[in-house]
């Protein structure tokens, strides 16, 4: 199969989405979105057929089932790589079911990385394994709803892990230990204060290691935004309204440091995280297909920045994430239960002298041992020590002062 498609690879990868050639037996498969010219989103059966075709055609690709939704739809993880690598990027696509552009961008990215024979793709996959959850909320996607079939916002479930979707993502992060987590979303604009083609934001949570935080900002400011702007898309910081004349920030409406959002949890778990949001509404009067293509193509432009970052800043990312994973074993420093990198914490939001650990009752341990395990938190029976890689996460799960705690453990101060 690969020898037959070699002649069309470069053109398929370089062409804009609208110009991908018509499907033929010897060309890469196309999504339902592409087949329709942007008139409709890819259906679940089309997605499954598309992924199966890519998997069969490329030995770079493997697909595994990482969970099942309440309505019995598969949660899948796609791995793209040519060999084992020390660096991993995870794309999480459409946690909100009514935000489809990220899913479409992820599907075409899977194909392009699977089929790509250009030097840039080969170089990327030599150093970096790319993991993709192409539809993180299949039930919500089928119903065109933000939440899953129970109405739960998956992107507010990365502490409690009550949903099958949240649990599957937690297990992937625990087991694969990605160095970068890239979370694709969409937003509704508020002209003229909040209306860019793309917004993005790094982990603001103050428990993020400084070097990981710095790399996440570098990913945003020096790679993702310039890549999008080079293709003609406007960019900005998610959650910040700005004056349309001066560009000065005038109001924050989202993007705080709460740990239950994947963007922040990624930082707490020592990965370089970034949220990306494409604007749903068009800036000018255009047809729905044309606007839908803009939504998806802006995401694809930003992804070019992510992959450039992975290649050019890989060594620095490896150093930052590795050091952050080791730092918790020193068991020093405060833990923050509030505040953000742009919102200094109140004294009550800082645990200046954290306990050695937390003791759980037998009933508490029985009730929450699965969630602790999915997070990757190390336990000693019913005792949960702070001296471990995920040191800062332990109080966020078990301390009475943490706003989204799982349960309240008994602090152990006898160190």
Regions found by a protein language model. Give the residues of each.
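Generic recognition of flexible, low-complexity loop/linker segments
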Residues: 64, 119, 169-170, 261-265, ...
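Active-site/substrate-binding loop(s) of hydrolase catalytic cores
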Residues: 86-95, 100-257
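Secretory targeting and sorting signals
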Residues: 1-25
